[in-house]
Amino acid sequence: MNSHFASAHTPFYINTKEGRYLVLKAVKVCDVRTVEFEGSKASCVLKVDKPSSPASERRPSSPSRCERMNNPGKQVPFMRTDMLQNMFAANRDNVASRLLS
């Protein structure tokens, strides 16, 4: 890893005027100069788009119970469990018959 970059301890919170933000991944940059500025004269502004609805409204609702499509007369087809074993046995028998003939 480059000596100028290091992973910051994540996750962590940042408190701002707009609210509290959870930072999941961050990179700590070393040896970079800091430029002092006044907020009223700043030419670069970080824009944060606020969500249009509260988080509780955006979250999908959890199902209250497990829903199944049960058809009592219809059984679920299962794959034969001995298929792989039969395939190896047939291969073994074919090889043995070729060797003996």
UniProtKB/Swiss-Prot annotation:
Top-rank taxon: Viruses
Modified residues (Phosphoserine): 53, 62
Pfam families in the record: Pox_F17
Any one of the GO CC terms: virion component
Post-translational modification: Phosphorylated on two serines. While these phosphorylations do not play a role in virion assembly; they are essential for the interaction with host RICTOR and RPTOR.
GO biological process annotation, one example: symbiont-mediated suppression of host innate immune response
Basic and acidic residues bias spans: 56-68
Residue segments, region Disordered: 48-76
Subcellular location: Virion
Keywords carried by this UniProt record: DNA-binding, Host-virus interaction, Inhibition of host innate immune response by virus, Late protein, Phosphoprotein, Viral immunoevasion, Virion
A GO term, aspect molecular function: DNA binding
Quaternary structure (record): Self-associates to form high molecular-weight forms. Interacts with protein OPG157. Interacts with host RICTOR and RPTOR; these interactions disrupt the mTORC1 and mTORC2 crosstalk.
Family the UniProt entry places it in: Belongs to the orthopoxvirus OPG062 family.
Function: Plays an essential role in virion assembly and morphogenesis. Also plays a role in the inhibition of host immune response by dysregulating mTOR. Sequesters host RICTOR and RPTOR, thereby disrupting mTORC1 and mTORC2 crosstalk. In turn, blocks the host antiviral response in part through mTOR-dependent degradation of cGAS, the primary poxvirus sensor.
Protein name in the entry: Phosphoprotein OPG062
Organism the protein comes from: Variola virus (isolate Human/India/Ind3/1967) (VARV)
